[in-house]
Amino acid sequence: MNLSVSISHSVKITNSKIYFDGELYLHEDSNLDAFLITAYKSLAITYPKFYKMDSMSKLGFIASELLMKNNLETEHDDYKKGLIIQNHSSSLETDKKYQASIQDIASPALFVYTLPNIVLGEMAIRHKFKGENTFFITEKFNAFELIRYTQILFDQHILCTAIIGYIEILDNEVDVFLSLIELKDNNKLFTVKNLEDLYSSQL
């Protein structure tokens, strides 16, 4: 069997819509908090810690849960499963909320989320991704850099599977795009064009 680094699934989340593999999964016109709760409930899982997460971690959790819904126990070594994520605003959304909270009483619950890579920890714990775990701050979604970095890890047999993409939220404006990358036969090839097409198809 000829295996290639391929895009198995993709998820796109905007302010009111979630797309899974290009198909509309959820549409709800409501405020962000209500939208995230509806999305979580649609997953039909019980994970109480979700309610304590900041918005960026909730977005990453929901997107990765959809990607992994049929792959919760994969055949891959947990130490060869990785996360490579980008965004533009780091954890500024939560930083601003924490800054507002310390005008009164500082919120420890918010403080623990004032690093952008905390979302990776939430995703890694849920899906046992114990390999490469990297968060890049970029001007915008950069398919070329995602592919360049991830391809090296696959070529060197450091990873067998990865969740990669972009998790951006600022002032309640959401732009999330994640893909599950695996060694597969006859799947969508892991190319800049394919990744950019998937990202832009639901803009």
Model-based region annotation:
Residues 1-159, 163-203:
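Conserved "HGTGT" condensation-loop signature of ketosynthase/thiolase-family condensing enzymes
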